[in-house]
Regions:
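Autoinhibitory propeptides
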Residues: 1-15, 35-102
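Structured segments of extracytoplasmic/periplasmic soluble domains
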Residues: 73, 159-163, 203-207
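Short, acidic/turn-prone active-site loops that include or flank metal/cofactor-
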Residues: 83-85, 137-144
Length: 236
């Protein structure tokens, strides 16, 4: 039992000891056999939210007693909370200081950009004369169409790819002909789970050859340092 407690993140260990939460959304790092672990989670009446194979992670929702049982399983390497990341602040005063020389002639024709953000509204500058929002995946509300209930993602996509038609070319993005592949991993309050971000990254990397994705925009930050979680990003 002592060795199994070493598999627990200190913050999660504290919460389990205090019994302050009924269900926990957690990240489970496994050695092998993710299907077997997923089966165990379901047998404990837990919910497997997603599996991120690139970094050997299962995201699940479990009760405290079930987490303790799962720790005894040899293929479970480490368990921590699925913490929130937040979108970076963006203001008009900051954005207005950006100047791009017209001599650079960057258009991005034939190139795609991945964006992990709060979504993207199908603004005229991104959809006319043809729609350049090629992919939209909603990990928050599972809606099938592009939208943005925060605004941050639309602003980000506009800076990257807006063609300026709605403003008579006054407000034009860096590369106004690139195609956008957007994963909505952040909610209307600008918060997103690490598991959703890692899943989005994994998917965009997998798609990169097919869609010629050369850049992935990650406009978010962590409120505190967690070595384990940061190593997961490195493993991708």
């Amino acid at each position: 039992m002592f060795s199994s407690t070493k598999k627990l993140d200190p913050n999660l260990k504290f919460l389990l000891a205090s019994s302050s939460i009924k269900d926990y959304r957690i990240l489970i790092q496994y050695r092998n056999f993710p299907d077997s672990i997923s089966k165990k989670i379901r047998s404990y009446h837990g919910n497997v939210i997603r599996i991120i194979e690139s970094c050997n992670i299962i995201c699940a929702q479990l009760k405290a007693s079930s987490i303790q049982l799962l720790l005894e399983y040899p293929e479970v390497k480490y368990i921590c909370l699925d913490q929130y990341f937040t979108l970076c602040g963006m203001s008009i005063s900051t954005a207005n200081k950006i100047r791009l020389s017209s001599k650079l002639a960057i258009y991005g024709r034939g190139v795609s950009v991945g964006v992990i953000d709060s979504g993207v509204y199908p603004h005229r500058d991104l959809t006319y004369p043809f729609n350049r929002i090629n992919t939209f995946v909603d990990l928050i509300n599972d809606l099938p169409y592009p939208y943005d209930d925060n605004g941050h993602g639309t602003c980000t996509c506009g800076i990257i790819a807006g063609n300026g038609l709605a403003s008579n070319k006054i407000y034009t993005g860096v590369a106004p002909e690139v195609t956008i592949h957007c994963f909505k991993a952040f909610d209307k309050l600008g918060k997103g789970y690490v598991s959703d971000i890692l899943f989005s990254l994994e998917e965009l990397i997998t798609m990169s050859d097919k869609y010629n994705i050369k850049v992935i925009c990650l406009p978010f930050e962590s409120l505190y340092y967690n070595k384990f979680i940061f190593t997961l990003f490195d493993s991708l």
